[in-house]
Curated annotation (Swiss-Prot):
Cystine pairs: C6-C31, C8-C27, C16-C48, C57-C84, C60-C80, C69-C101
Main location: secreted
GO molecular function, one term: serine-type endopeptidase inhibitor activity
Record's function text: Thrombin-specific inhibitor. Appears to form 1:1 complexes with thrombin. Prevents blood clotting to allow the insect to feed on blood.
Source species of the chain: Rhodnius prolixus
Record-given protein name: Thrombin inhibitor rhodniin
Pfam families, per the entry: Kazal_1 (PF00050), Kazal_2 (PF07648)
SUPFAM superfamilies named in the record: Kazal-type serine protease inhibitors
Domain Kazal-like: 1-50, 51-103
Length: 103
Protein backbone atom coordinates (compact mmCIF):
# COMPACT_ATOMS: atom_id res chain seq x y z
CA UNK A 1 0.00 0.00 0.00
CA UNK A 2 3.05 2.23 -0.06
CA UNK A 3 2.56 3.71 3.40
CA UNK A 4 5.09 5.77 5.30
CA UNK A 5 7.69 3.88 7.32
CA UNK A 6 7.34 4.41 11.07
CA UNK A 7 10.15 4.88 13.54
CA UNK A 8 8.85 2.89 16.50
CA UNK A 9 10.87 1.83 19.53
CA UNK A 10 11.59 -1.86 19.91
CA UNK A 11 10.01 -1.83 23.38
CA UNK A 12 7.64 -4.73 23.85
CA UNK A 13 4.30 -3.56 25.27
CA UNK A 14 1.80 -5.65 23.34
CA UNK A 15 -1.62 -4.21 22.55
CA UNK A 16 -4.65 -5.75 20.85
CA UNK A 17 -6.05 -3.86 17.87
CA UNK A 18 -9.68 -3.72 16.75
CA UNK A 19 -8.65 -5.79 13.71
CA UNK A 20 -7.87 -8.75 15.99
CA UNK A 21 -4.11 -8.34 15.46
CA UNK A 22 -1.58 -8.10 18.28
CA UNK A 23 0.86 -5.20 17.89
CA UNK A 24 4.23 -5.13 19.65
CA UNK A 25 3.51 -1.69 21.15
CA UNK A 26 1.10 1.26 20.77
CA UNK A 27 3.42 2.92 18.25
CA UNK A 28 3.24 0.00 15.83
CA UNK A 29 -0.57 0.04 16.15
CA UNK A 30 -0.64 3.77 15.35
CA UNK A 31 1.71 3.14 12.43
CA UNK A 32 -0.75 0.60 11.00
CA UNK A 33 -3.60 3.08 11.61
CA UNK A 34 -1.92 5.77 9.54
CA UNK A 35 -0.80 3.35 6.84
CA UNK A 36 -3.99 1.82 5.52
CA UNK A 37 -6.14 1.05 8.58
CA UNK A 38 -7.70 4.42 9.52
CA UNK A 39 -10.43 2.84 11.68
CA UNK A 40 -7.94 0.87 13.82
CA UNK A 41 -8.10 1.44 17.58
CA UNK A 42 -6.57 -0.23 20.62
CA UNK A 43 -9.01 -2.68 22.21
CA UNK A 44 -6.89 -3.47 25.27
CA UNK A 45 -3.35 -3.85 26.57
CA UNK A 46 -1.83 -7.27 26.06
CA UNK A 47 -2.06 -9.66 23.13
CA UNK A 48 -5.34 -10.44 21.40
CA UNK A 49 -6.85 -13.78 22.28
CA UNK A 50 -6.97 -16.11 19.25
CA UNK A 51 -10.75 -16.36 19.39
CA UNK A 52 -11.48 -12.85 20.65
CA UNK A 53 -13.67 -11.76 17.76
CA UNK A 54 -15.16 -15.24 17.35
CA UNK A 55 -16.77 -15.03 20.81
CA UNK A 56 -18.77 -11.95 19.84
CA UNK A 57 -19.73 -13.49 16.51
CA UNK A 58 -20.89 -16.74 18.11
CA UNK A 59 -23.32 -14.73 20.23
CA UNK A 60 -25.12 -13.90 16.96
CA UNK A 61 -25.95 -17.53 16.21
CA UNK A 62 -29.71 -18.00 16.30
CA UNK A 63 -30.54 -14.29 16.12
CA UNK A 64 -33.53 -13.48 13.94
CA UNK A 65 -33.17 -12.38 10.34
CA UNK A 66 -33.70 -8.62 10.38
CA UNK A 67 -31.45 -7.23 7.63
CA UNK A 68 -29.48 -4.03 8.11
CA UNK A 69 -27.27 -2.09 5.72
CA UNK A 70 -23.73 -1.29 6.81
CA UNK A 71 -21.71 1.81 5.93
CA UNK A 72 -19.72 -0.51 3.63
CA UNK A 73 -22.93 -1.06 1.56
CA UNK A 74 -23.12 -4.72 2.59
CA UNK A 75 -26.41 -6.17 3.84
CA UNK A 76 -25.98 -8.04 7.15
CA UNK A 77 -28.50 -10.59 8.50
CA UNK A 78 -29.03 -8.48 11.63
CA UNK A 79 -27.38 -5.82 13.78
CA UNK A 80 -25.40 -8.46 15.70
CA UNK A 81 -23.77 -9.65 12.48
CA UNK A 82 -22.91 -6.04 11.59
CA UNK A 83 -21.28 -5.54 15.00
CA UNK A 84 -19.39 -8.80 14.53
CA UNK A 85 -18.05 -7.56 11.18
CA UNK A 86 -17.06 -4.23 12.73
CA UNK A 87 -14.56 -5.97 15.03
CA UNK A 88 -13.34 -8.61 12.63
CA UNK A 89 -13.57 -8.44 8.86
CA UNK A 90 -14.69 -4.81 8.39
CA UNK A 91 -13.28 -2.64 11.21
CA UNK A 92 -15.21 0.61 11.61
CA UNK A 93 -18.33 -0.46 9.72
CA UNK A 94 -21.44 1.21 11.15
CA UNK A 95 -25.19 0.98 10.64
CA UNK A 96 -26.24 2.95 7.57
CA UNK A 97 -29.95 2.08 7.77
CA UNK A 98 -32.32 -0.73 8.71
CA UNK A 99 -33.35 -3.04 5.90
CA UNK A 100 -31.24 -4.38 3.04
CA UNK A 101 -28.83 -2.11 1.19
CA UNK A 102 -30.25 -0.53 -1.94
CA UNK A 103 -28.43 -1.47 -5.13
Amino acid sequence: EGGEPCACPHALHRVCGSDGETYSNPCTLNCAKFNGKPELVKVHDGPCEPDEDEDVCQECDGDEYKPVCGSDDITYDNNCRLECASISSSPGVELKHEGPCRT
